[in-house]
Structures are given as structure tokens and as C-alpha cells.
Amino acid sequence: MDCMITKLNEKDQFISKIKDSDSKIGQFYHFDAMQEKSYSERLSMSNNGREVALAQVIKNYMSDLTLTEKQLQNISLLSEGAKVIIGGQQAGLFGGPLYTFHKIFSIITMSEKLSKDYNTNVIPVFWIAGEDHDFDEVNHTYAYNAQNAKLQKIKYHTMTPPEASVSTYYPDKAQLKDALKLFFKEMNETTHSKQMIEMCTKIIDQYDSWTDMFKALLNEVFKAYGLLLIDANNTELRKLEQPFIQKIIEHHQDVDASFRNNQQNTIANGLEQMIQTDTNVHLFLHEDNMRQLLTFKDNQFYLSKSDKYMTKEELLKILEVEPERFSNNVVTRPIMEEWLFNTVAFIGGPSEIKYWTELSEVFNTLDVSMPIVLPRLRISYLYPRTEKLLSQYQLKQHSIIEQGIEKDKEKFIRAQASQTFVDKVEEIKVQQEKLYQSLLTEVAGNNDNQLLVEKNNHIHQKQYEYLINRYLLNIERKNEISMKHFKELSETLHPMGGLQERIWNPLQIMNDFGIDVFSPSTYPPLSYTFDHIIVKP
């Protein structure tokens, strides 16, 4: 395998501004990601004293997995105070989109770099967002059917989606296996398919909850790197979080005020508003089998789905006895994560690193230091077949990754068409426009006749446009094979109008190039970069 770096002209310049240490953005982070002193300062910061308990929670959480020596060593190092690089993601079906794996590679790459540069131990940690309850975001994935050059949506169907967190959801194993069968049916059958299906089936059989299956898959792929995993909704973890949840409850008005003020400042500085929330408590409570957002009104805490009010004392009593019933929202989750871990840097997707700018004051209010914030690596896979087509049509990969294929496709069709034919029709259109302008002069003052002429002109102009479009469509149909090639390029490099990593599933890459394609022995060594990486399997 090989990899190369390419620069894309991005519409959104946010990541470029971080790279350039833009002060308008930098004022909302606690550290400049581009300054070496930021890393040395984070690495030398005092630990929070929770590392022994946290390491034990992670060890217990991962006890149902087959761990490598490196993972066991990292758990031990974590308990001794080793700093971490951290990032997280929702538990997507069959691993979710490729960018989940790329986020993990970003965490691993940065932890290895800092360990080497500073001659210390920096541990890679992946945070599974198991407390989320929006099942529609994780219940599907896509498989690329090379024969039809088409992406097929694969969905796990259920009549009873979880009302609470996905980590407490136990999917129907037979239906999950049906989805797996459909997933592999869409893809090419390769020498790796049987082994892949066996691995996934074994995970479905061995584990019960949605996030445990996700955890097991990630561990299979990344255990050799020493990656540690934790579910944000883990019961033992929630017990450890208990005092900080209490602090959020007791200071919820200050937390909300600092968040709202911070958000207004980011907007005033020209940044896009990222977090939309009506709550003023920024915590969820599990009540009546539902994960419900707490709101403070009429001097009490209110649950809208259950239409219940609670006093602060009642809420704190629940926290004392059943802390696992509480969970964080988008505002408090990052702060909780950093309260737990001794973090050097948080690595997030483009939207995540944006919404962290809205939390700077919340970190201060809760006396937690915001770590360095970095964007994850962005990676596309260039298949040999794709490379061959690019060469055949003399196209640039970075152009398609960035803008899609439509302009190149239109250029190809026009090249096969008679430009004389198109020009003559365009000429007729211009001549007719002039003719109708003279007709309008003849009927000036008669509103009905003016409307009649304008309408008739419009009909004729439409007919000429139809003639050109239909002519080009016939050219397109005549070049059916080339059109399929263009579709292939689109679905592989710019699927559904965006980056490959946002749509494609990592199991597709494993099915095509081997179950160990993401392992240290096969995957090319990565260097952290703000630019786009192209991997050639």
C-alpha cells in the first residue's frame, strides 16, 4: 500500500484558519494547535488524580475482548498517569462510515508522534458515544456495487427503535444477520469475503448490545495499535463521573449562561452557529424508559416527555443512588470527557472542532482545561480500477474528490457531439428572440397580445432548449459504457456529492483488500497533516 498527500480547495476555510493560527478562531480555544509549546505544556500538566480509577473502568469495559500486550500495557500506563489523545464517534452499523476509522487512525498517529517526539507514553483512546439515542443516525450504512456502479443503502430494520441510549439497545440478531447478508451481497465476492462474513457473524453471536458489537469490531481492527476503548454510557464510568454531574446540576445556570455568552461571541466573530439546544441544564435523565432532556423552569427540573417536575434535592438523590440514569448533552459531553482523562489533544471531525469553539467559557466555568483541538485526518482510497479510468479519460483525482464528475462528464459529452449542430440551434434561438422583439413592438399597447407573443416566444425557446438537451442525451446514451465509467468515478471518489469517507463503509475496503488491510503490517504509515491523504491499496 502507498499513500500521497493532495491539497483540496475547500469551500469551508475553518481548518485552514486553524493551520494559519487565525486569532479570530484561536481566541475560542485554550491552546494553539500549531505551536510546539502547546504540546509540551499539555504533556507537563498535573494529572487529575482519577487515572487509576479510570484505567480500572476501561480494563473492566474491555474485559470481554481479546486484548493485545500493547493494550494491556497501555491500560497500565494510563493508571500510572500517561496522557492521552482522544476522540469519539457514534456506533454506526458495521463500523459506520470510513471516517470513524480515519478518526481512530488520527488518534493513533498523533499519540505515536508525541510519544516519539517527547520520549514519553501517550495513549490512543477512542470514546464510543453510546449515550446517544438518535438511532436513525447509526442504523444504516452503504455498500458499493461495482457491477452496477451504484451505492446501495443497507439498513437494520426494526419496529422498536431505542427510546434510550444505543448502548442499552439489544438488536434482533437474525435481522442484523439479514442486513449483513444484504451488505455482502451488494459487494464483489472476493477471496476475503468468507473470512469477513465469519468475523462479523461471530461478533453478532458473541455480543448482545449495539455498542458492544461496535466495540468488538473496532477491537478486531485496531487492537495491534494498542487502542483503548470506552463507552460514554458505561455504568462504572458514570459512577466515576458522579461528582462532576453533581457540579453541573448545582451550577447549571452558570454553565448555561457561559455557553450562551460564548456562542454569541463566536457568532459575533463571524463563526457559524453549530449547537442548537433549548435546554438550560445540559443533562439527560433516563425516566420512564426514555432518555429525556432536563429543563429548569418554575424553579424546578422538568422532563417534557413524562411531564414531570423534580426538585434539585430529588435529582441529587437519584444521582447518589443511580448515577447511570444521567448522561451528558452536546455541551457537557466534551467537558466531562476532559474532566475524566489527562488529555493532550482532542481530535474531531470538521463539525466537532467547530462546535468546541462554543464551549471555551463552559470549560472555564467548570474549572476544566480545554485540550489542544485538532481536525482528524481526511482520507480517500484510490482503487487500481479507478486509477485506470482516470488515466483513460485524462482526469485529475483531486478535482473529482473536490468537485465531483459533472463538469468532466459534460465536457466529454460535448466533445462527442457536433458543436456545429449546437451552435446552429443557439443561433436560431438568438434570431427568434430578435424576431419576437419586433413582434412585441407591433403589438405595443395591447396587453393581451403582448402576453400572447411573450408566451409563444417562451414556448419556442423551451423547444430549442429541449432539442439541444435531447440531442446531448442521445449522445450520452450512445456512449453508455463511458457514462458508466463516469458514474463509477463519481460513486468512488465523490459519492452522494461529498467525500468518500463520509459514505463508504470500512468493511468494503477490507472485503476488497484483506481483513488485515488496516493493520500496522499492511496499512501505510501516516503522518499527521491538514491536507487530504490518498491511499492506494
UniProtKB/Swiss-Prot annotation:
<keyword id="KW-0436">Ligase</keyword>
<dbReference type="InterPro" id="IPR055399">
    <property type="entry name" value="CC_BshC"/>
</dbReference>
<dbReference type="Pfam" id="PF10079">
    <property type="entry name" value="Rossmann-like_BshC"/>
</dbReference>
<comment type="function">
    <text>Involved in bacillithiol (BSH) biosynthesis. May catalyze the last step of the pathway, the addition of cysteine to glucosamine malate (GlcN-Mal) to generate BSH.</text>
</comment>
<dbReference type="GO" id="GO:0016874">
    <property type="term" value="F:ligase activity"/>
</dbReference>
<dbReference type="Pfam" id="PF24850">
    <property type="entry name" value="CC_BshC"/>
</dbReference>
<comment type="similarity">
    <text>Belongs to the BshC family.</text>
</comment>
<protein>
    <recommendedName>
        <fullName>Putative cysteine ligase BshC</fullName>
        <ecNumber>6.-.-.-</ecNumber>
    </recommendedName>
</protein>
<dbReference type="InterPro" id="IPR011199">
    <property type="entry name" value="Bacillithiol_biosynth_BshC"/>
</dbReference>
<dbReference type="InterPro" id="IPR055398">
    <property type="entry name" value="Rossmann-like_BshC"/>
</dbReference>
